[in-house]
Amino acid sequence: MRSSAASDVYKRQVIGMKKLRSEGKLDDLDVSEEINACSIVVPVEIDGKTEEWLVMFKNETHNHPTEIEPFGGAATCLGGAIRDPLSGRSYVYQAMRVTGSADPRVPIEATLPGKLPQRKITVGAAAGYSSYGNQIGLATGHVQEYYHDKFVAKRMEIGAVIGAAPRDTVRRERPSAGDLIVLLGGRTGRDGCGGATGSSKEHTVDSLLSCGAEVQKGNPPTAVSYTHLTLP
């Protein structure tokens, strides 16, 4: 569930998009019933010929998971961002990471009760994100970490990606009774159960001890094989 403030922002974005479309200002928007990633239509010149391609953008925030399990939280932040344009049948080829931390130089003794030290979060998150990106073969062209005292309350961990695919290779059909469903995913264990709701429930100073297992452990060596299914 979203917080009230976040929900209001989301509603305003949807209303804004509808207004822009009604004014004819989003002619390049790829409209579909799928909810995977922001998708636009762009002309691409290949060997002297112009083709229509779909370019897809997606970002993922893993503030809470990274706060309690830095390595896994940041790793699956990138993995989750890759998942959606991949579901849209596009090949993800570039990433961006924007994060926020309190001062990582603060002595461990000054760590707030129920929190990990800022240095532990910052270093662990950087290692987790880069580990996933290196193993799945995705270049991150922009990395920016902001430092502010307010981030001591909650870490900011944002991963964003961009993917693309020839428009004529993306088939969109409605499912019907009797269709065969194939599930693809990286190998994982029991970790991650409850992770989707973890950021919305009330936490205490003891949450750090019990919620680490809710953060999914990604498996990029397995996942990389099905990213190749979308290669143009």
Show which residues each predicted segment covers.
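Single conserved hydrophobic/aromatic residue that forms the stacking wall/gate
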Residues: 1-6, 10, 228-232
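Mobile "lid/hinge" segments at catalytic clefts and subdomain interfaces of large enzymes
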Residues: 36-43, 51-229
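Gly/Pro-rich turn-and-neighbor structural signature
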Residues: 5-48, 52-53, 137, 141
